[in-house]
Amino acid sequence: MGFFDFFSPDKKNSAANIAKDRLQIIVRERRCCDRDPLYLSDMKRDILAVICKYVQLDPNALHVQFEQKEDDVSVLELNVILPEVSSTGDCSKP
């Protein structure tokens, strides 16, 4: 590093480039999080209705998560907390 290099602006680490990089990260994160399909809430309601035909279930026991892994790969993850089965093995509604 020469003497005059100290006074010249560093193009890689200028404040504008740092701000630009940070803004790109924020935009990328928001795009990733906002990719839930519009039909996801309807799908969750329908899945809950089907499950409730067979077991009594609290609506808060169903968790639905949608992830966009790559441009062409989407993952829909369902977590259902089912009630405990009685000792008789009867799974019907009480």
Swiss-Prot record:
Cysteine pairs bridged by disulfides in the record: none
Native source organism of the sequence: Hamiltonella defensa subsp. Acyrthosiphon pisum (strain 5AT)
UniProt name for this protein: Cell division topological specificity factor
Keyword Cell division: yes
Keywords in alphabetical order: Cell cycle, Cell division
NCBIfam families: minE, PRK00296.1
Statement: the UniProt record of this protein carries the keyword Lipid biosynthesis: no
Taxonomy, superkingdom: Bacteria
Family, as annotated: Belongs to the MinE family.
Annotated GO biological process: cell division; regulation of division septum assembly
UniProt-listed SUPFAM superfamilies: Cell division protein MinE topological specificity domain
Originating gene: minE
Taxonomic placement: Bacteria, Pseudomonadati, Pseudomonadota, Gammaproteobacteria, Enterobacterales
Functional note: Prevents the cell division inhibition by proteins MinC and MinD at internal division sites while permitting inhibition at polar sites. This ensures cell division at the proper site by restricting the formation of a division septum at the midpoint of the long axis of the cell.
